[in-house]
């Protein structure tokens, strides 16, 4: 006798989708939100903003005897710091058919166009958060063992994901040796998988199109971030700190050693000893902050013999009364000591959609066909954010690099 079951009657059964769609991405953008939303941004127009910086005091000084010759007059050294605007974009594309199919709740969980336009703002903030931590040249990672191979080994793969299209740039910034799609990332081995490309040690990887090679060392279209700001012996905002040491940040290499309380205090003192004010925040990774918490826990003393309600973990970590905060986009093995008032997000235009060529306020347009004069049933749109990061006083910021931490 034939038994009626869910298999042979599947055509009359319904599928119930009662749960909402879920986005399981790493969307938190702490530093960007802190600087752009909690701190005043600075609006400007033009190619760049600049501000005068006094880099050396008047040296026309001296102590003399009775009726001695007075010192020869000196003057302060003042230079213009130039902060160039950076232009950032996200491209969106969807078919006209999917727009119609998802127009109401009967057809889709969510309208596809609404979803894409909502998500792109989150994605742009996340990308901005990554760039706030940039070293020079917008590097995603540096090749540590050059090879002609599908597998490339980097110092870090923290900011690289499957699907990224990346350029391989020679160490001198003069040659792009190939554009490749990333098909695999091994965060333990710190390698990426791409179509075969030939690299040399110290070559570096950037997002496709974000670096323009040239015979003079090339130009990054990304922001000069905290790793560059807190470094020493570098050019920041067109001022060379090898000439003017007061323009240096405060950098200490840890050589793989743990960053303990004493090291945090050293960073605090390095910044404070510049005599321009103390820092106000530590910013680091989960692994480094956890090690710091473990050090504090090992030193804990319970003076109340009746204390029995002991809870694990911690709610806040402070060193020298300054909060130690985690940001998952902070580079691994790194601790920053920051003075947030010295960091300014400079906006030429707020995040928003680029208007179409028609100039009628529209933000979407039909895609051009490969045949001249024809269109295809696909909509296109671009989200833009023209901004950069300015540091008014790099000496009030610092960094510990190469700290003991988790893997990439």
Protein language model features and the residues they cover:
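Core alpha/beta structural scaffold of self-assembling particle/tube/pore-forming proteins
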Residues: 1-62, 74-408
């Amino acid at each position: 006798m034939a038994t009626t079951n869910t298999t042979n009657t599947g055509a009359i059964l319904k599928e119930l989708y009662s749960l909402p769609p879920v986005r399981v991405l790493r969307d938190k953008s702490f530093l960007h939100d802190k600087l752009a939303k909690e701190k005043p941004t600075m609006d400007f127009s033009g190619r760049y903003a600049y501000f005068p910086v006094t880099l050396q005091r008047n040296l026309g000084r001296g102590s003399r005897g009775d009726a001695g010759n007075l010192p020869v007059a000196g003057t302060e050294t003042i230079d213009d710091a130039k902060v160039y605007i950076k232009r950032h974009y996200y491209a969106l594309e969807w078919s006209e058919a999917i727009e119609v199919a998802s127009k109401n709740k009967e057809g889709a969980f969510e309208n596809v166009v609404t979803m894409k336009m909502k998500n792109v703002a989150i994605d742009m903030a996340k990308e901005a958060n990554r760039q706030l931590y940039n070293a020079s040249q917008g590097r995603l990672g540096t090749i540590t063992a050059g090879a002609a191979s599908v597998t490339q080994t980097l110092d870090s793969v923290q900011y690289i994901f499957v699907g990224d299209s990346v350029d391989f740039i020679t160490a001198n910034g003069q040659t792009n040796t190939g554009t490749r799609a990333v098909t695999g990332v091994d965060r333990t081995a710190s390698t990426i998988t791409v179509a075969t490309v030939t690299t040399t040690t110290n070559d570096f990887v950037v997002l496709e199109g974000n670096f323009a090679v040239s015979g003079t060392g090339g130009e990054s279209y990304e922001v000069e971030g905290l790793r560059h700001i807190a470094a020493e012996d570098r050019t920041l905002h067109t001022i060379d700190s090898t000439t003017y040491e007061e323009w240096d940040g405060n950098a200490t290499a840890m050589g793989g050693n743990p960053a303990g309380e004493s090291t945090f205090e050293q960073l605090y003192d390095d910044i404070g000893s510049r005599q321009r004010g103390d820092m106000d925040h530590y910013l680091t990774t989960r692994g480094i902050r956890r090690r710091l918490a473990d050090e504090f826990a090992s030193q804990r003393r319970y003076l109340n013999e009746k204390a029995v309600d002991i809870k694990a973990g911690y709610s806040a970590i402070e060193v020298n009364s300054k909060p130690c905060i985690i940001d998952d986009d902070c580079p691994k093995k790194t601790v920053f000591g920051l003075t947030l008032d010295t960091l300014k997000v400079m906006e030429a235009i707020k995040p928003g959609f680029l208007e179409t060529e028609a100039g009628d306020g529209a933000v979407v347009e039909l895609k051009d066909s490969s045949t001249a004069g024809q269109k295809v049933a696909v909509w296109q749109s671009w989200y833009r954010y023209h901004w950069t990061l300015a540091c008014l006083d790099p000496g009030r910021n610092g960094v510990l690099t190469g700290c003991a931490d988790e893997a990439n």
